[in-house]
Amino acid sequence: MIHHSLVIPAYNETLLLPRLLDTVDAARAAYRHGADAIEVIVADNGSADATATLATARGCGVVSVEPRCIAAVRNAGAAMACGEILSFVDADSRVHPETFNAIDDALARPDVVGGATGVRLERWSLGIALTYLAIIPVVLLTGMDTGVVFCRRSDFHAVGGYDERRELAEDVVFLWALRRLGRQCGKRLTRLTHVKAIASMRKFDRHGDWHYFTKIIPGALPALLRPSARTELARRYWYTDDR
């Protein structure tokens, strides 16, 4: 019986998906309820490479999603899921061996609605360190984080999943909605910092180690004020083939 469904959004991920799946296999092997209680779903966003073929060969369920919208991709994966627990991780990440056990333990607590594992970074530099320092206060104040994001399937549907009207920050909006839902019944988001995922630095490799300060922050205000600027920022940063 499937207990836990892991959804992996993917677009042209033949290079990095195998190393993620290697770590997922290790986490499934360590799962106290057995590897067969975990299903892995790759939501393929119209890849031009062999992502779907690779995922199928590795035993993953595969769902094809046409719109270039990360929220729609995550939602399509969730719609295919059978587990009572849903989790989401990016294809360029790697997961900790105790991830699924830690998520089970967290959601067994009566005061937890969901959360995330947080991440460790593959490499550091001054620009990356300052970016991290700029972001971490928000994480600490809100309890929201990245890495492997998880919740009960019932709560995912209660908040409507990821907002497909949003071209960016849909993950933040989802966690805000989950947080609001939890507060209605005395629950909170949690961070599982003892099982952090490992995040790749490909955004920094492509855009530069200082790009949060030279591109993202300067582009944030226009993106808030003008839909066209928001679309262009999302396209350049998230939806290019060489992202």
Label the model's feature ranges.
Residues V65-A81:
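Glycine-rich, basic loop-to-helix element that forms the pyrophosphate-binding segment
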Residues P97-G127:
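Conserved donor NDP-sugar-binding/catalytic core segment of glycosyltransferases
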Residues D25, R32-G46, V63:
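Short beta-strand/loop segment that forms part of the nucleotide-sugar
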Residues E13-R32:
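Short, well-formed alpha-helical segments that are part of the catalytic scaffolds
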Residues D155-A158, R166-G186:
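A short, conserved alpha-helix in the catalytic core of glycosyltransferases
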Residues L86:
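Short aromatic/hydrophobic "clamp" motif used to bind/position activated sugar donors
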Residues T23, D44-A52, S93:
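A conserved acidic beta->alpha catalytic loop
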Residues A50, V89-A106, W176:
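Acidic donor-binding/catalytic loop of UDP-sugar-dependent glycosyltransferases
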